[in-house]
């Protein structure tokens, strides 16, 4: 994960570092891994989220397509079958408390059996 982030432009390193810290604030037990040979993922009783840098933004994939988003952070992937996305562009503010709340919701559903089981 450190290597992935280190090779990004400075502004993307800052965003990834801040988001990474918030992910661990949501639950210190979250583990970091690389999936699909390049994608930083965070897991705890299942996939929680993943980061992916693009040319002009960072995608934060949240692995629960059925989760509520009371603060309106999710801005892509509403119709996706497995994840919804928060796209973060250079200069975008990161709403720390709202993001931590979303992450904690995914973790709670993972611990309860995962969104597929809960919605199935």
What are these regions (language model features)?
Residues 1-120:
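Charge-dense, helix-prone N-terminal extensions
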């Amino acid at each position: 994960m450190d290597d992935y982030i280190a090779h990004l432009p400075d502004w993307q390193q800052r965003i990834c570092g801040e988001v990474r810290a918030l992910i661990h604030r949501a639950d210190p037990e979250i583990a970091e891994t690389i999936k699909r040979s390049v994608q930083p993922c965070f897991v705890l009783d299942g996939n929680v989220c993943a980061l992916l840098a693009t040319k002009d933004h960072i995608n934060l994939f949240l692995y629960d397509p059925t989760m509520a988003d009371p603060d309106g952070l999710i801005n892509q992937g509403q119709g996706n079958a497995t994840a919804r996305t928060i796209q973060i562009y250079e200069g975008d503010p990161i709403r720390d408390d709202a993001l931590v709340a979303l992450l904690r919701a995914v973790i709670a559903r993972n611990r309860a059996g995962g969104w597929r089981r809960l919605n199935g």
